[in-house]
């Protein structure tokens, strides 16, 4: 198609792109309606685009197509390995430092006249010392990771089975298990 006006051509459809409908990326121009991932057809913007040659992708599709391949690379939760590396002599040890919460917290709250009971210590939690996390009221001093004891904030916690954890301990204890996950490259050393 001839380009009579001398304007820029869209990197996808090769038709003329006018200023009002133009999106620029890596020196190329695109129609707003053509600025889509080549694979999944999601709309792109400057924060979500990944370029390979003259093809444009969303970051997710780009990673799947051109990212690292092989064992242990993130293809999603459906493909995680449950191999613990035992065939390579790696031993997995369960931590026993878990301190369970008080199972009688609700009875304690009734006993003290309606104030909430702290799930960690079972004592009444009054407004001046109350922190809310995982849908429960905690003392500020009890609002700590159940594994490592690190102080938490309502935005930095993860909860499981009524207990609260820092993001690191939660990932180590309840995240994906298996060879190549969660320990970093130093743990992948194999010595004979």
From Swiss-Prot:
Signal peptide: none
Gene Ontology cellular-component annotations: cell leading edge; cytoplasm; focal adhesion; nucleus; stress fiber; Z disc
SMART domains according to UniProt: LIM
SUPFAM superfamilies named in the record: Glucocorticoid receptor-like (DNA-binding domain)
Keyword NADP belongs to the record: no
Protein name: Cysteine and glycine-rich protein 1
Subcellular location: Nucleus; Cytoplasm; Cytoplasm, Cytoskeleton
Domain free text: Glycine-rich repeats mediate the association with the actin cytoskeleton.
Reported tissue expression: Most prominent in tissues that are enriched in smooth muscle cells, such as gizzard, stomach, and intestine. Lower level in the heart, no expression in liver, skeletal muscle, or brain.
A Pfam family matched in the record: LIM
UniProt main location, coarse: nucleus
Gene Ontology biological process: muscle tissue development; sarcomere organization
Locus of motif Nuclear localization signal: 64-69
Ranges of residues in domain LIM zinc-binding: 10-61, 118-169
Function: Heat stable protein, that interacts with zyxin/ZYX. May be a component of a signal transduction pathway that mediates adhesion-stimulated changes in gene expression.
An example molecular function term from Gene Ontology annotations: metal ion binding
Superkingdom field: Eukaryota
InterPro entries in the cross-refs: Znf_LIM
Subunit note: Probable monomer. Interacts with ZYX.
Keyword annotations from UniProtKB, A to Z: Cytoplasm, Cytoskeleton, LIM domain, Metal-binding, Nucleus, Repeat, Zinc
């Amino acid at each position: 198609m001839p380009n009579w006006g001398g304007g820029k051509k869209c990197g996808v459809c090769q038709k003329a792109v006018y200023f009002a409908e133009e999106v620029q990326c890596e020196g190329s121009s695109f129609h707003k309606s053509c600025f889509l991932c080549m694979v999944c057809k999601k709309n792109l913007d400057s924060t979500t685009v990944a370029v390979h040659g003259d093809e444009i992708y969303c970051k997710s599709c780009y990673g799947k197509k051109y990212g690292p391949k092989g064992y242990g690379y993130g293809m999603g939760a459906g493909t995680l390995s449950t191999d613990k590396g035992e065939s390579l002599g790696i031993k997995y040890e369960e931590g026993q430092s878990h301190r369970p919460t008080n199972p009688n917290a609700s009875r304690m709250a009734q006993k003290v006249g309606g104030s909430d009971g702290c799930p960690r210590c079972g004592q009444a939690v009054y407004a001046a010392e109350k922190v809310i996390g995982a849908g429960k009221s905690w003392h500020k001093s009890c609002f700590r990771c159940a594994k490592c004891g690190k102080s938490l904030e309502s935005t930095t916690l993860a909860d499981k089975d009524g207990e609260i954890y820092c993001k690191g301990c939660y990932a180590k204890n309840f995240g994906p298990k298996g060879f190549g996950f969660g320990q970093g490259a130093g743990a992948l050393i194999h010595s004979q």
